[in-house]
Amino acid sequence: MRRRTATRRPAKKAPLGPMQTYLVEGLTHEAKGVARLNGKVTFIEGALPGETVTAQVNKPGRRFDEAVLNAVIETSVDRVSPACQHFGDCGGCSFQHLEESAQRLAKADWLAGQLRNLLSKEQIECLFDVGSGYRRRARIAIDHKKNALVLGFRSKASNRVVDVEQCHVLTPSLQTLFVSLKVCLKQHPILSSLGHIELLEDTKGLSVVLRLVSNITPVQQQAYLDWAQQQDVELYWQAPKASRADLTDEQMRYYDVSNLRLKYHPQDFIQINEFMNQKMVAQAMAWLAPQKDDTVLDLFCGVGNFSLPLAQLAGSVIGVELQESMVQAGRHNASLNGLKNLSFVAADLTQPVAGQFSAENINKILLDPPRAGAFEFLDTIIHIAPQQILYVSCNASTLARDAEYLVLNGYKVVRAGLMDMFPQTSHVETMMLLQKQK
């Protein structure tokens, strides 16, 4: 007998609580106002510190409530009108309603809280640059459930695609390219065959990656090749089920940093903020201060964003990266820039590999791990026993965890800094220098 499958009903939304008046005292790193009512913490999206607001609880909890903003009775002097018409719906930006200097102060406060066991807020140095038009890479989502053309970014509250007309954090050239691409997609519909789209701007120019989930006709393909030629854009296709397209050296992308040229595959990771990347690399060189008698290990090195600048100054540099394709790109970049003191190794940095570098006399380490941090590799670092460790992180909470472990094992924090790599968003990049204690 065939068993009948029960129909899953969507969860009912909790009814809104009564309208309440709140005095907002603080701000979370996700840009939610922090208030208290009868001693219980309430997080209010869209409310700013110093404001008196009315709001209704929509997600009650045992330890705290979440509420939706109804009205602002007394407005903060730091509140500004968002530049983007999609702010509040699009999940990309969370701080556009807060004046830029106040954004930076809020991020510094949050970072100080994360690192409170290691140093004081006054010790945190800050790097900032432009607050808009900085993003040189964007992944565009497609809504396949609608007949109309819906391209943009995911909603803040769901996986729904917000139909974006303009994005203020994209570079001006990418904004123009996005508008032109939408016109082309309307004229030559291939949405049912598209998984998603990536836009890129680098030293080489503009490019578009179209990731296909099914094949398109030669006529359709030619229409996009013609469009790309008219727009002076390099077009890349990723075929259905293909993980990575093989490219010739001429087809590879490239960007410049520290007077060096780095080639990379369009699917490789690069920092999305060119201005801040230049500043970040320069600061890393200044803090770590590599000399000709230094041997530096660059962990999670990618295609050599830090490795190549290090090799200009140090006696020897070893870059370590999991992906073999990026290791090959790093080697090519070293050769391209004439750096004979730089080598690259493919290794899984979640596994002990200390013996691999035991004969190298490594005295300095730079690491730039993913959001999960580098906890599995810390014992290997401690075994190598470098005099200095420069830790670059996109997740301050895992940085704090890893740094506290290093401090327990003979290191001290010398410097720490916030780098506002992602203005208007809740994300920050952090740099920390640790010194081995004698």
From Swiss-Prot:
Disulfides per UniProt:
none
SUPFAM superfamilies with a match to the protein in the record: Nucleic acid-binding proteins (SSF50249), S-adenosyl-L-methionine-dependent methyltransferases (SSF53335)
- Catalytic activity annotation: uridine(1939) in 23S rRNA + S-adenosyl-L-methionine = 5-methyluridine(1939) in 23S rRNA + S-adenosyl-L-homocysteine + H(+)
Enzyme nomenclature, EC number: 2.1.1.190
Q: Where does [4Fe-4S] cluster bind?
A: C84, C90, C93, C167
Q: Which InterPro entries match?
A: 23S_rRNA_MeTrfase_RlmD, MeTrfase_TrmA_AS, MeTrfase_TrmA_CS, NA-bd_OB-fold, SAM-dependent_MTases_sf, TRAM_dom, U5_MeTrfase_fam
Q: Which domain of life is it from?
A: Bacteria
Q: What does this protein do, in the record's words?
A: Catalyzes the formation of 5-methyl-uridine at position 1939 (m5U1939) in 23S rRNA.
| Name of the protein this chain belongs to | 23S rRNA (uracil(1939)-C(5))-methyltransferase RlmD
Origin species: Marinomonas posidonica (strain CECT 7376 / NCIMB 14433 / IVIA-Po-181)
State the encoding gene: rlmD
